[in-house]
Structure formats: structure tokens, C-alpha cells
């Protein structure tokens, strides 16, 4: 009973929205009445439901001037003062409990894209919404925690030790083991297994529980460590496995209500339920659960890590135990045998059904879920047009239904980040795009073709188009307009792409100016449902008469957040607003995806906006 109630409480926390929680509560009460016929359970769950509403309700936290360093990550620090947290990016060498004064606080913003990790959203779930890079040290801590960290950081094997003890991720360690805290947990069970041969197990568990709390105090209370401590406490309080799991869920949800979907909590929970309820082929079910979770959370799975998961978990436990004294540790990065896949809703729903059914009774036919990623890739009937959010640069990807063809327009680079390495290639891998049929480089500017040399080394590019007289070889109308034109500069020589699919027409302008727009008006009778606005929304493009003649419904703008050029210009935005053209800008909403199937077309943005395009 308590396990069912705790799972209901967990569902309320996941839903977050108060109205959704109330609706779920009504349906769940009906289920509880049917299952238990006990009004006291009703009352208990109503209390849990109300508690979840309180826990998920947004709280206004006032930013402070001074903070103490409570977390250290690779490339940044987390400062805390009362209930306020801030992300600190600085070259200063800070340690735990150092006190700092901060200035120039601003909201956290990253260039978010579909299927890729969102640093902004990750921090929002930890109630961290602001950042600064202007820091002054007020007081250097001399606490034991600080001195211990500085000592370990100075060791030759510090990268692996810091990853296992502090969760400061290093490329030499597979990320899943640090996120799930398997270094500490495996070490715990190794010690428990050795000591219980001579002493009472309950007493040993109590001692190790105290040690775990002390470890968190002197190192860091990661999500995985907190969950593990709660579970170990539950084993001392309850003899029933379901009650132990229920206690862990309830306590963790109350402490971290916004992080109940973290892999650090979800993965151990699902594996615990498999361990308790699944009676047949438990090893296979565990591997299938890990496979699904890796795809859902990381969009990839290393097959070596998957099949030898238990062996590597124990290995990390041994390294965790002897990390203090071993000076040179081997590189633990596993050989790369990785499958990339970004699950859609179909896979997630099937995974949930598979999991529930396997808890009841495993059947070999459930393994059909393994082929879903491969079928889903080549069975997508939608025409897809993606505008990636790569800062002050351009990159769009056009995918024909069933992966029949892939066209990329531009692959711009960034002075402060390798867009190809960090965004374009991970996106292509997650979409299982292994070749580009046609790459159109609109013109010779770094923010449009700067990534070409890097891209061609990482993926097959069958054809590159840099001239308007070339043809795009696809099975739908695709034209490069105005091959003969009068151009004064590189921007005006931009290739202009015009294509049609499912009765929806697209016009991609590159960096062409108003002069070129006027030449288009006199040369063609153009209509376009969607326009990729010229020159990142600069006022050198987007002539009002030109836009009006197109009869556009949607305008796409690719530009960097708070870029130094002021793109998109107020003038351009005003023109688009006056003409009642719906405008989507990557700096505001992240990457943009447009889908069409026959006469049904819609747009989705990375920040969750959805809209239907009527033609």
C-alpha cells in the first residue's frame, strides 16, 4: 500500500502543474477506492497530493551579494546563501566554503537545441537561475572540507578521484557511473560484504550509515548519495522491501521535489523495482531498462558499458576505496561502441509499457522494443526543417520523409565555441543522420561556412553547392534563385534557396540585402509560407514591400543571444509585426523545427512552443 501511495506522490511531483496534479489526484483516488476500499488511504493520499502542490509551487528567492561555495563542477562553481543559489564562472581557484562577493548577476542562458543537453534547464531543476563571472574572494576557507579538496586536487590521479568523490565529471570516466554514484555504492557493499563475515550485519549497517552521512558532509551530498543514504536508513527502519522503496521515494521527493526525474534517482529506483518484482530473466530486464534509460537521458548507449555494467560498477567501487593511496590510475574511458538515438514519444510510451509488463511477467516478445529505434528512424513520414540554435551563425537541416534525403544549408562557426563539435554533429548523431546528401554554403562568411572543413572530416558530404547555377538533387521542387544578379558584396552573393513540400513553400535568404530582395520581386512572382529572414534579422534586409509580397505566415531568425550587432533589429521586428507574420528567433526560443505531412503542418520550438500552420 505505501509503495503505491509513494508512486502516486512521485507522479504528482513529476506533473508539477497544480491543475494536472488535482486531475491526477481525482483519478488516483478512484483507483485507490477500487483497490483498497479504505477511506483512510484516501485521506493519506490527499495529504500527499497537497504536499506535492506546496513543494512544486514556484518560490521567489531574492538574490544576495555574498555566497559560500557549496558545489564545484567542471568549469563552474555553485554558491549558496540561505535559499538563494548562483552559478559562478570564473578563473579564480575557489574551494568549498570560500566566501565570495558577486556582481553583474544575469539569467543563465545557453544555446539550447532539440535532443541535446540543456544546461539552462538542468540548473533550473536545481533552482539555479542566475549566473555571474564577476567575483571577488572575501574569505578563503581553511575548513577540513576545503583542505581535503585541495589535497585531493593536487594528487597525480586527481581527475578520476575528483570524479568519483565529488562528481566533477572527467572524460576519462564513463559519465553514468559518476552520476549514479556507483563508485561509493559499490565500495559500500564491498566493505559490508567483508565486515559482515565477522560482525553483526545490522550494527555494521548503522556504522556505515553514519559514515555515509559524514562522507557527504566532508565531500558533497550528491543526488545519488542522498538517495542511497535514505535507502540505507529505510533498511534499518523497515523489513519489507516495498516499504523501504516507498520511504526512499517519499523522503527524496520532499528533499528534491524538482529533481525526481533525475537519472540519479530514476535509474536506481527502476532497477530496485525490477530486483523485487521481476522473477524471471532478471538480468535481461535490467539490461533492457538500462538501455532504455540511456537512450532517454543521454541519447546514446555504449554497448560495452551496458553488457559489462555490473563488472565496471564493482571496478569503480575498488578504485573508490583505494583512490586515496593509488597514485596512478588507469584511464577508465571505455572503448567507443556507441549507438546514438534520440527517443520520441513512441519509444518512451513503449518503454513504460514494457517495464510495467516485465514487472508482472517477462515474455521474450517484449524484446521487440529493441528494434523500435531502428524502425523509427526510417519510418518517419514527416518532412522536417530544422533551424539550429548555434549562436550568431546559421545552420538549417532539411530531412525528407523516411530519411530519403538530407540537405543542410550552411554550417556556421562561432569564435567562442566549435559549433560543429558541440551542436551540429551531436544533433545529426541523435537524429541518426550519417550522411549529408547536399550541403549548400550560401556565401563565404565564417558564420555561414566556417564549419565546413571540420564537418567534412566527421560526416560524409555527397555534394557541396556554392554556386547558384548548380542543382540540388532531391525529389521535390528545390531552386536556387537569382543566379544572375547585381551584388556589391559577399552578403549579396548569398545563395537563395526556394523549395516546396506538402504544399508548404520555404524561402531561405542567406545574408541577402534589401537590394537583392527588390531584384527578386522584379524577377519572380514569389509566394512563401515560411521565410528564413535575411542577415539574422538585420535592418539591411527584410524590406517591407518584399515581405508583404510573399504573404508569409512564419518568419525564422537565427541569431545569438545578446549579440554585439543588435540582431534582430527593432526595425525588422516591427515590420514583421505590422505584417502579422509570426516570428520565431533562435536566441529566444532555441532551435526551431517545422514538420509537414500532406496538408498538416506545424512548428515546434525547443522552449516548448507549438503552433499549427494553416495553408
PLM-predicted stretches and their roles:
Residues 51-177, 421-422, 426-429, 435, ...:
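Membrane-interface helix/helix-cap signal primarily in integral membrane proteins
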Residues 37-62, 376-377:
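Transmembrane alpha-helices and immediately adjacent membrane-cytoplasm interface residues
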Residues 519-592:
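Cap/insert and terminal regions of metallo-dependent hydrolase folds
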Residues 10, 18, 22, 26-42, ...:
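Hydrophobic alpha-helical transmembrane segments in multi-pass membrane proteins
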Residues 1-7, 28-30, 320, 328-382, ...:
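C-terminal regulatory/interaction regions
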Residues 434, 440, 444-472:
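Active-site HxH/HxHxD metal-binding segment of metal-dependent hydrolases
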Residues 257, 361-438, 469-530, 538-541, ...:
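Core dinuclear metal-dependent hydrolase active-site scaffold
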Residues 125-232, 236, 480, 505-514, ...:
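Aromatic-rich juxtamembrane segments at the membrane interface
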Amino acid at each position: 500500500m505505501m509503495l503505491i501511495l509513494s508512486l502516486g506522490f512521485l507522479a504528482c511531483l513529476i506533473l508539477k502543474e497544480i491543475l494536472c496534479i488535482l486531475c491526477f489526484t481525482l483519478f488516483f483516488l478512484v483507483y485507490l477506492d477500487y483497490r483498497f476500499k479504505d477511506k483512510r488511504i484516501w485521506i493519506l493520499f490527499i495529504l500527499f497530493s497537497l504536499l506535492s502542490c506546496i513543494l512544486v509551487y514556484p518560490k521567489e528567492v531574492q538574490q544576495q551579494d555574498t555566497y559560500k561555495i557549496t558545489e564545484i563542477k567542471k568549469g563552474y562553481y555553485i554558491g549558496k546563501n540561505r535559499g538563494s543559489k548562483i552559478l559562478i564562472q570564473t578563473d579564480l581557484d575557489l574551494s568549498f566554503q570560500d566566501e565570495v562577493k558577486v556582481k553583474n548577476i544575469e539569467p543563465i542562458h545557453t544555446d539550447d537545441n532539440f535532443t541535446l543537453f540543456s544546461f539552462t534547464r538542468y540548473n533550473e531543476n536545481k533552482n539555479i537561475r542566475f549566473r555571474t563571472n564577476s567575483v571577488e574572494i572575501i574569505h578563503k576557507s581553511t575548513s577540513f572540507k576545503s583542505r581535503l579538496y585541495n589535497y585531493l586536487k593536487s594528487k597525480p590521479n586527481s581527475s578520476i578521484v575528483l570524479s568519483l568523490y565529488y562528481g566533477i565529471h572527467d572524460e576519462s570516466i564513463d559519465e553514468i557511473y559518476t552520476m549514479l554514484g556507483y563508485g561509493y555504492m559499490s565500495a559500500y557493499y564491498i566493505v559490508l560484504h567483508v565486515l559482515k563475515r565477522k560482525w553483526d550485519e545490522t550494527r555494521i549497517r548503522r556504522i556505515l550509515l553514519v559514515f555515509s552521512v559524514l562522507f557527504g558532509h566532508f565531500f558533497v551530498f550528491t543526488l545519488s548519495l542522498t538517495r542511497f543514504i535514505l535507502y540505507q536508513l529505510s533498511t534499518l527502519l523497515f523489513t519489507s522491501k516495498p516499504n523501504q522503496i516507498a520511504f526512499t521515494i517519499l523522503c527524496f521527493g520532499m528533499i528534491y521535489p524538482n529533481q525526481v526525474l533525475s537519472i540519479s534517482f530514476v535509474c536506481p529506483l527502476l532497477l530496485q523495482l525490477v530486483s523485487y518484482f521481476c522473477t524471471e530473466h532478471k538480468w535481461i530486464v535490467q539490461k533492457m531498462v538500462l538501455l532504455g534509460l540511456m537512450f532517454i537521458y543521454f541519447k546514446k548507449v555504449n554497448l560495452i558499458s551496458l553488457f559489462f555494467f555490473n563488472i565496471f560498477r564493482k571496478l569503480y567501487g575498488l578504485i573508490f576505496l583505494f583512490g586515496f593511496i593509488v597514485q596512478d590510475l588507469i584511464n577508465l574511458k571505455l572503448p567507443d561502441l556507441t549507438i546514438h538515438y534520440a527517443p520520441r514519444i513512441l519509444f518512451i510510451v513503449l518503454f513504460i509499457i514494457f517495464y510495467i509488463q516485465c514487472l508482472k511477467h517477462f515474455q521474450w516478445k517484449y524484446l521487440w522494443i529493441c528494434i523500435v529505434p531502428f524502425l523509427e528512424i526510417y519510418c518517419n513520414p514527416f518532412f522536417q526543417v530544422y533551424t539550429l540554435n548555434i549562436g550568431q551563425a546559421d545552420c538549417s537541416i532539411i530531412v525528407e520523409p523516411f530519411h530519403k534525403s538530407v540537405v543542410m544549408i550552411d554550417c556556421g562557426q562561432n569564435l567562442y565555441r566549435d559549433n560543429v563539435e558541440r551542436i551540429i554533429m551531436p544533433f545529426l548523431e541523435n537524429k541518426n543522420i550519417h550522411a549529408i546528401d547536399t550541403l549548400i554554403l550560401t556565401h563565404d562568411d565564417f558564420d555561414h561556412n566556417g564549419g565546413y572543413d571540420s564537418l567534412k572530416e566527421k560526416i560524409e558530404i555527397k555534394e557541396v553547392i556554392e554556386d547558384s547555377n548548380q542543382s540540388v538533387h532531391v525529389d521535390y521542387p528545390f531552386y536556387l534563385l537569382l543566379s544572375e544578379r547585381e551584388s556589391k558584396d559577399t552578403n549579396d552573393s548569398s545563395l537563395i534557396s526556394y523549395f516546396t513540400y506538402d504544399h508548404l513553400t520555404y524561402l531561405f535568404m542567406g545574408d541577402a540585402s534589401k537590394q537583392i530582395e527588390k531584384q527578386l520581386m522584379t524577377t519572380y512572382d514569389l509566394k512563401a509560407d515560411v521565410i528564413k529572414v535575411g542577415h539574422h534579422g538585420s535592418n539591411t534586409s527584410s524590406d517591407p514591400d518584399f515581405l508583404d509580397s510573399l504573404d508569409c505566415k512564419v518568419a525564422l531568425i537565427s541569431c545569438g543571444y545578446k549579440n554585439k550587432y543588435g540582431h534582430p533589429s527593432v526595425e525588422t521586428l516591427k515590420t514583421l509585426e505590422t505584417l502579422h507574420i509570426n516570428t520565431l528567433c533562435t536566441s529566444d526560443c532555441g532551435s526551431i523545427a517545422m514538420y509537414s505531412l500532406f496538408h498538416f503542418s506545424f512548428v515546434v520550438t525547443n522552449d516548448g512552443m507549438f503552433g499549427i500552420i494553416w495553408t
